[in-house]
Amino acid sequence: MTMGNFLKRFGSGKSRSSRNMTLGTTSSQSHEPSPSDPSLSLADNTNATKKKYALIPDRFSSLDQVSKALREAGLESSNLILGVDFTKSNEWTGKTSFDGKCLHALGETSNPYEKAIFVIGQTLAPFDEDNLIPCFGFGDSTTHDEEVFGFHSDNSPCHGFEEVLACYKRIAPNLRLSGPTSYGPLIDAAVDIVEKNNGQFHVLVIVADGQVTRGTDMAEGELSQQEKTTIDAIVNASSYALSIVLVGVGDGPWEDMRKFDDKIPKREFDNFQFVNFTEIMTRNSPESAKETAFALAALMEIPFQYQAAIELRLLGKQTGLAKTIVPRPPPIPYTPPTNAELPSTASPASPEQTQSCPICLTNRKDVAFSCGHMTCGDCGSKISNCPICRVRITNRLKLYT
């Protein structure tokens, strides 16, 4: 059975019924409090539900099991939102997995982001009934860790994943990769979409190459500003009918993302999961088997998250508290100078260019590492490996002018 046919078994109607459900080892009886049962208050029931879905385990071993659980939960379709990471680290996290090239490099061979978007389209798009996919980029020199940009200047969604790929290929060459990495603004944008769509269930898929930015000299348990922003956004998103799937591309490292749930304080339900796309797609298996494994990993927790949204009464809920997010337009294409404008001999880079931090591209370099490369102090305090040569940073020398 192809992935498309498998997922089309869910049907095309946007059913939001909360009929009795049997998911894994949970009871088949509804968890809604009975109006005739005065012993269980609404608050007690809600607290019990939060505890039940505080950490959702991976309980399925096949797509058929996921299919059955989704049908029993009443989830016949969903709405996808896509976010793409354009931070500076994409330039070096393809050293092993993409022949040393930037993960966003376009050419005859599909880059990891193109592959991930294609496979997501093959495996998850059949969930999306209307085939309208809001798409955002983040981490470039226009958004940094504070905003997102839309794939269309009018912020309209893409019509299917073919258009998603076409827009990505049009946008990628125009970008200046930057950072630092925070998923907070993207998650806030997804929450805003859920709110504006009257609490319909959505799945946010984030395709990214790295963990949230964290300084090497930070104490255990201490959080960077980007980690705080991301965690706050995830906690806030758990009050909405939204599941978050982080799809990791490139070399990683991904250790912190696998443990990220442990850093997140009490939520309404466990709404975040990580899938290592590189690990799955480099297995020695047929392509169809790898796509199936990816779909299983990405969909594993969706049935439980949807059931949690029902029991917590998040479906159809509008809080009136969601941040209103206005995405920036996609980056403007870079126009190189014409031959008439070019000097007769090559000119050396200006002092401003050579002294700009290679990560944020705005601040001046004022910190040197033991390898000899330099960044600005702000960016240099948040990385553990040199962004140029990838050597581990053991010393930082502050430079004064």
From Swiss-Prot:
Residue ranges constituting the VWFA domain according to the UniProt record: 79-299
Q: What happens when the gene is disrupted?
A: No visible phenotype under normal growth conditions. The double mutant plants rglg3 and rglg4 show decreased sensitivity to jasmonate.
Q: Name one GO biological process term.
A: defense response to bacterium
Q: Which UniProt keywords apply?
A: Cytoplasm, Jasmonic acid signaling pathway, Metal-binding, Nucleus, Transferase, Ubl conjugation pathway, Zinc, Zinc-finger
Which parts of this chain are annotated as the region Disordered? 1-43, 326-350
Q: What is its main location?
A: cytoplasm
Q: Which reaction(s) are listed as its catalytic activity? A: S-ubiquitinyl-[E2 ubiquitin-conjugating enzyme]-L-cysteine + [acceptor protein]-L-lysine = [E2 ubiquitin-conjugating enzyme]-L-cysteine + N(6)-ubiquitinyl-[acceptor protein]-L-lysine
EC identifiers of the protein: 2.3.2.27
Protein name as annotated:
E3 ubiquitin-protein ligase RGLG4
